[in-house]
Amino acid sequence: MKHLMSGNEATARGVYEAGIKICSAYPGTPSTEILENLPQYKDDVYCEWAPNEKVATEVAYGASIAGSRSFCTMKMVGLNVAADPLFTAGYMGVGGAFIVVTADDPSCHSSQNEQDNRHYARAAKIAMVEPSDAQECKDFVALACEVSELFDTPVLYRTTTRVCHSKGLVEFGQRTEHTHAPYARNVRKFVCTPAHAYANHPLVEERLEKLREYGCTRALENGLNKLEMGDGRVGVITASIAYEYAKEVFPEGTSFLKLGLTFPLPMDLIRDFASKVEKLYVIEELEPFMEDQIKAAGIPCVGKELTGLLYELNTQLLRQRVLGQKADYRTVDVAPANRPPALCPGCPHRGFFYTLSKRSEERRVGKECRKRG
């Protein structure tokens, strides 16, 4: 039986099915609904709100060190707060699987910037997984756990606003219980002194090479990466929600290499794919993260010179900029209602900000959502 779910609801289901035991999060659109949907699995998954993203990351990583599969979620600007433990975890590795959700927000629907957190995976030298629809949001959690434990790495699980909030049919599976060995003290692995970090860095680089090979082989078998060959005239390399747009826009016969494991890139697979098409496009939102690496490998491709660096993509934009077709925009002569952002219903800060709004003297506040107060 299939269920109609948002990407966030499906991710929560994926947490349950993957045998994850611990989940900690700090709320922030577009990621909030993941933890909100986990209490229904409370008999199998312990979940809690953390006071900030750094604490959420440390709670989950502590559970991983102890041997449990763990998961933490935050919006993309929250990863700035959590960067300290994340980078260190990249050197130390994991016990049980350790998954960190970063929900990016192209077009700034609910955020103060448009930062592209894919760069964090590259900087921290950890694996990154990107689902493109609700079914993959569920399925890829288990695959991310496989990657994490197989390669001893944290996994950055990157979604976007449209992936989080769009809905699709999701087919459920059964929970797979994860049994872990009892905690064993390992100072060299989990105490990141300078000497230990120095010794671990070569292992991190070796891990990236093994992940690249995995992306070319096993990831094709389990569906994390997908190859769809057409007539060989046009090829598209894409990931995340951009795949859904490209699949709808490009004509029949187009070849697609859809990447779910987007760091490190499976460059041998990409090079082989590029050799089989006459013209290669790289379709991605925000920064030319994949495009720059592909061009650096000496593979000619077309990307950001057409799609641009700003805002989220959509089907009309791709038709206009990539295919040169006239966009079929429809407008109405009605001014939209003014709807400034507001604090979410049930937010404990609503009363505080209401009180502040009634005071005329100067006030200074430091809450992230202060702009909504």
Regions found by a protein language model. Give the residues of each.
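Thiamine diphosphate
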Residues: 1-134, 160-162, 229-230, 253-256, ...
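Flexible, low-complexity linker and terminal segments
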Residues: 1-8, 18, 131-343, 348-352
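RNase H-like, Mg2+-dependent phosphodiesterase core
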Residues: 373
